[in-house]
Each structure stands twice: as structure tokens, then as C-alpha cells.
Amino acid sequence: MRLSKSFFKTLREVPNEAEIPSHILLLRAGMIKKTAAGIYSYMPMGRRTFRKIENIIREEMDAKGAQEISTSVLQPGELWEESGRWSAYGPEMWRVNDRNGRGFCLGPTAEEVFTDIIRNDITSYRQLPMMLYQITDKFRDEARPRFGMMRSRDFVMKDNYSFDRDEAGLDESYRMMYDAYTNVFTRCGLTFRPVEADNGAIGGTGSHEFTALCEYGESEICYCEKCDLATTVEKAACVDAEPVEAEMLPMEKVNTPGTKTIEEVADYLQVDKKQTLKALLFETYDEDDKVNGYVAAFVRGDREVNMTKLVNALGVHEYAIVFADEEKMSEKCGCVGGFTGPVGLHDCTIVADSELPGLKNLVAGACEEDYHIKNVNYGRDWEADTVVDIKNLLEGDPCPVCGAPIRHARGVEVGQIFKLGTKYSEPMGATFKDENQKDHPIVMGCYGIGVSRTFQAIIDMPENHDENGIIWPMSVAPYHVIITLMKPDDEVQAQVAEKIYDELGRAGVEVILDDRKERPGVKFKDSELIGIPIRITVGRGAADGMIEYKMRREADKVELSVDEGIAKAIETVNAEKDGRHFFNK
């Protein structure tokens, strides 16, 4: 490809909507263009990289015996009604009606469709195990699209589903996909960590999330450096604080004007935040989007409520619980915003974190403006409807496995695998007959990769970008080599550039020739910005048969003969183009 003929434009300025390096660089490098909020188009160079990621995924899926199919993005609502998710899924689902009023959705996921496919064709244990996958567009009506493809409304995912006769078969399929995902993300040049995760809206009995580690990620993981514990914050079990051995003091109502936050009341009363009680207020909704209850959740003042744990404790869908309208909840339950405590609350579900019964003499809101109560004790002064772990695991908290201090890291969720069991096969009637002609529900697994997210997350790795632009790994780079022709009108330089271009192409190297009539500085800046791994510069040395050879990851440039440069480029590309060299690092 010649850059002069390519649909290609770079930006010098940072687009206003871009906040993180990967989003900034993809827009500046002309890899993507914004169509609307959360909707992007892939330009030629971006599309080349995207295809390479897809092909790596296909190679690893095929190697595990998975077969590729393609299903419609438009999914009938009745399939989702069979699984029970049509009413449970929240406003993120795009719903449409056809001219006859029949409900459809733009698929945010594909469990129902794949289950429908196999229930009609798999009838015998002899047909199991089976594994099918697709790479296709997905749609979610994100309330606040941001960070480019990290949280977009239209994105590409790889869906993979395994179908087994029993849990042992599922365990084997799950292990194979765990290994395949490790290979995919390694070959793409990601620094990542598999962690235990909550199953969320997908459901099932077990899950791992693959998190690409970078400071800009929205996911937070917990891990222990002493043992093998690694988990998302949402999934992490917590060790309760040691019970306090102290006398229960009499409750004392105190005036605390204007102290609506934990920090303010702790400072005003000169107590540690650990000695306070934090309240979070919620309202829950029924299937008709009407408020059907209120919830007050209490944790120690220095902690945060873990919404995943709270949702699981209440047995509600994550879309059916939101922060309460405090004015309405005050009228119904007696709470007061900023001064809510458990004493005096009524007509709401009270959830207490599991460590609260062991603490003594806490400061809590008095359910009265500008007042708190000192020396509030669980059991004597208040009780909860549910006592369960609903707190986040904090940095430095003891590991629930070995007791060593927990560490936190941020990252981007690029993939997740689930043990679905019979969550979908039972309600949808996907069964098989065993050797004795007895019917059993098919045992399923679900495995997803965010292809769009992976595309962007690669750049957010610290080693894959710098102040000048992208540094693509060879395995996913749009081209392996860029030839920068300094003077296209110079006959000798042009002949040398053409020779390199032709010989590299014949050797299977993907090469782009920058033959634009631009200033050398513009060409160098663009080559750095788009991140092609190898740059060969053809300039004044061409008359003596010399070129300049530079790796994008390295600062040094070396002068080589034309033949040496060609040979070195071919050797480097062949060693790195499939990404398997990362396994040796």
C-alpha cells in the first residue's frame, strides 16, 4: 500500500471528547472516527489491526475445536421471555417492534439464540461436547458512553458457548477456554490477569474475568502477593474486623450541625471514621418500573458498599435497584439525608454488613436534621433484616485465604468466561438423551471477548504507547514496516524505496510506502503516531546503497545497507508476527 493512495488523515490536536491515551491516539492516528456518542467507524488502518485481532481469536478458538457460526443481531423477544431475561434486563437493551408489534432486541449478548439453535439439533449424548462461536456486533444503550470503545453503544464481541452432558464436561470446556483466552491476550501483547468474578446478569455458578492491567481501566481487582488469590472487587470476600471487647455505653444524642458526610461528623466529634456507621439508601423497582420497596444498607464508616454483594443479598436484578429519592424515602421510612441511622428507621429493608454486630459504641445518624447518636450498638439498639458481607475489600485488608495484605490494581475487562450450568437449557428445553434414553438438560458454558475493547486496551498498555504515539505489537500492527521516502521526486531514492517495497512484499511482509510529497518532519511524526513497528528511511544515503533502520520501540537508529535492512526486517517480522514470541517473555 502507498500512503499517497490511502484513505488516511492524522490529527495534531487532541479531540475534546478523548480522555485516555488509547482513545486520544486512535482518533489522532486516524484509526477510528466518531459517528455519534458511543458509536465509532473504523478507518482502513484501524480495520487492518481489528482483523488481525479477530484472526488471532479465530486461530485459538479453532485450535480448541470450536466452530464459527453467525447469528442475527436482531433477536426475537420471545426467546428472552423463555429465559426470563426479557423483563429482567435493564434499559441498556435496545428494544424494537416490527410492523406487527412483535418485540425484538438488538442483541447485547447471545445466550438465548445459541440455546435455541442447539435445542433443535442436538438430541443425543453422542453429539456432545459441542462448542460454537461467533464474532459480531453487539449493542447496549449505555447511559454515559465514554473512553471510546471501552464503554460504547455499538461494539464487537466474540461469543463462545460450550455444550456438555455434565459438570465434568463443562469443567474441561472451561479449562480449554481459559487456556485459549490466555493465548489470545498474550499474542495481542496485553499485560493481563485472570481473576475470579461475579456472574452478573449472565448468571451461572462460576466465572473468571480477564483484566488488561492499566491505570486508566474502570475495573478494579484485588490480589494477594503471597497466595494465588486474584478477584474482582465485586467478587472479593472480606475478613470481618475482630470483634471489639468493650462495655456498651448508653446512647447519647448529640447536635452535629451541617455534618452530612462521614468525614465531617468524624472530624466534628473527633472520632476515627472506623467508629462511625455509614448509611446508603436505595429504592427497588418491580417489572412495571414502579417503586416496590426501600433499602437501607449499613457499613463501617471507612468502607464502601459493594453493589454486587448487596444485589445478590437482596435477590434483585442489578437494574432494579437505584439510589433512593431521599425526600420520598424520608416520608415513608423516617430517614433524613446525611443524618440517617438505623435507630428509628421503619418500613424499609435494613441490610447490615457482617462485621457490624462485632463493633461497639458507634456514631450513627439520628434520623433527625443536624443530630447524630453516639454509642449505637447492634443487637441492643437496632437489628437488621439481613446481616451479610456487603463491603468492598480495601487495600491492605487481610487476604481471606492467607491473611497477607491485599493489593489493588486497575484494568480493563477484555474477556470473561462463565459456567452457566443449566440456567438457560432448563427453561428453554435444551435437552439430550443419555445411553438409557433418559432426558437431561445440556450443561452450558459461555465465553466472551470484547474485541473492540481489546483493540483499544492494547494501546493503553504502558509499553504500547509513548508521548509520540502508538507502539503496536508486531502481531496486530496494521503494517509491519513503513518505508519513509524522503524525496519522492529523487529518482535514486524512489528506486531504492521501490526495491525494498517489492522485496519485503514478496517475503510476506506487510509494508506501506510513505511516498507523499510532505516535509520529512511530517512523515516522521505520522510514522511515530500510527505506531508501525519498523521504519526504514530512504534518504540521502540511498545513493550509496544505505538506509536508516529503526524499531518503533527503540530510540536508536542504525545505518544499514539496503540488503541488510531488508534481511533484518524479514527476520524480525517472521519472529514476531504471530505474537507467539510473547510466550517466552
At which residue positions do the language-model features occur?
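NTP/phosphate- and nucleic-acid-binding module
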Residues: 1-585
